[in-house]
Amino acid sequence: MINSSKINLYSYVCSIFIMSIVVISLICSEALQIQQAKEPFRGHLTRVTIQNYNDYLLAIHCKSRDDDLGFHILAKGELFGWKFHVNFRYSTLCFCGFSQRQINKGVFIIYVASRDFYRCANCTWKAEKDGFHGYGDIPTRGYLFYNWLN
């Protein structure tokens, strides 16, 4: 009889231990879901830089769906840049409007995750005479992405 009561006690302690682990796991899972709702998953950090290579002042105004980065005027050689985390759906999009005095040069997509996620973590754009050149993580190799409208 003594052996059977020891087995029952052992079984009871094991059951309590397993139930405790299940309850703690559920509580932790719920807490993690609440924390993720407050602070969603952040993708890798991306840096965008725009540099004016023209002899004139270049006005730029950049935005994303969530942020307005403001209006900036760049003299020749000046830079404007910002950093952001690509969202987990890879739908991050930033665009900028460009002008020279009253002349509209165009509105261009500066970053779209579907195009740029693997192209660059440090995306450099150079405003040159013919248009807007994009450089990826290999800075010596730029491409003309957009021609100026005027």
Swiss-Prot record:
This is S-protein homolog 28. Its main location: secreted. Glycans are attached at N122. One of its GO terms (cellular component) is extracellular region. It is found in: Secreted. Belongs to the plant self-incompatibility (S1) protein family. The keyword Transferase does not apply. GO terms for biological process: rejection of self pollen. It comes from Arabidopsis thaliana. Keywords: Glycoprotein, Secreted, Self-incompatibility, Signal.
